Amino acid sequence: VMIALDVSRSMELGTSHASKKEALTVITASLLFSALSDQVNVGFLAFADRVVDFHPPRRARADCWTILERLWALAPQPGPTMLKPAVRALSTRLRRSTVVFLVSDFMTDEDVFDGGELSVLAAKHDVIAVVPEDPAETALPTGLGYLRLRDLESGRAKTIELNQDARTAYGEQVRQHHDSLTQGFYRVPMDYAFLRTDENSVEQLMTLLASRLKA
């Protein structure tokens, strides 16, 4: 098992009881110790606009704690989210067929599905996308007034007026983003799950894994 983790600044977003980074840490811990109980080698790769850390697959409880400590200690990385460098690194470094969990919000300006790198990785390995989402990313708050939004990665900010038209337009952008990702995952092909940070992320992940066993 290889867990590839997005550690860009957008993963720091948290408007519910957990940030996306906290949610992915819980998910990572669950995957690590599940793999350990099944006596499966496990490793991790951390990335933002480049690969920032790599721990090759090993089978030891101490390695699980090392991975979690290194993950939690990683400061938010500057720059935009770019998945292709991580995908290329995984293709190069993983010699044996591996289950790869690609954990990212996929908030990126690059077309990760263009160029075929992800399809090449998925042809050799079992790749599963895990997409954590904060409630603030899926809908604007109710009520009237003005809301200032800031991109955690670029630092750009803008103020919008809260009204029904703005909520409808925002909802349409979210739907288009979901549709684009879903269609891309289908073309690769690869399994995926959108996990909300205001819900039990482990239960959501277990639902995905259980559905894979039934397939």
What positions do the PLM features span?
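Exposed, interaction-prone extracellular/peripheral surfaces
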Residues: 1-29, 33-215
